């Protein structure tokens, strides 16, 4: 086991991450929202406004899952006292305007703050803008 993996498993936030990630892997807005605080902030830094509150987050996630078919390629996880940083790659199944399917890869970075109750209080998501722009343009999606 690598040193990074040993550190990840030693963090008290590792089990919180694991439960949280299951929500995303299974595309379950209710599970994801249940692990956030009532006053949570979820912010995809792509020019859009932050999503504020657990109920708004649940709706936002449901919309994401309805609009996009994506999976995860896991990268590094770094833990602090009240946060984790997660590098991952989004694997998007998209189609060109003529219907031809293609797969796009977009590098992502999550910065997640956890409150004293073990709830996700804030999640900031950063994406590789160039990769995302190229994928969406190829699919004819205007963002």
PLM segments and residue spans:
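A generic signature of intrinsically disordered, low-complexity regions enriched in glycine/proline
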Residues: 22-25, 34, 50-53, 114, ...
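A beta-strand edge to alpha-helix "cap/lid" segment located at domain peripheries
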Residues: 2-12, 58-143
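A solvent-exposed, acidic/Ser-Thr-rich amphipathic alpha-helical stretch
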Residues: 10, 14, 22, 29-81
């Amino acid at each position: 086991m690598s040193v990074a993996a040993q550190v990840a498993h030693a963090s008290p936030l590792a089990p919180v991450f694991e439960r949280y990630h299951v929500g995303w892997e299974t595309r379950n807005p209710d599970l994801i929202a249940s692990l956030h605080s009532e006053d949570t902030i979820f912010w995809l830094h792509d020019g859009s406004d932050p999503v504020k509150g657990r109920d708004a987050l649940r709706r936002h996630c449901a919309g994401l899952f309805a609009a996009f078919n994506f999976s995860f390629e896991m990268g590094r996880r770094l833990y602090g006292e009240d946060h984790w940083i997660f590098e991952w790659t989004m694997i998007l199944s998209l189609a060109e305007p003529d219907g031809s399917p293609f797969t796009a890869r977009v590098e992502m970075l999550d910065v997640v703050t956890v409150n004293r109750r073990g709830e996700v209080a804030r999640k900031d998501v950063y994406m590789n803008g160039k990769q995302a722009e190229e994928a969406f343009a190829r699919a004819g999606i205007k963002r």
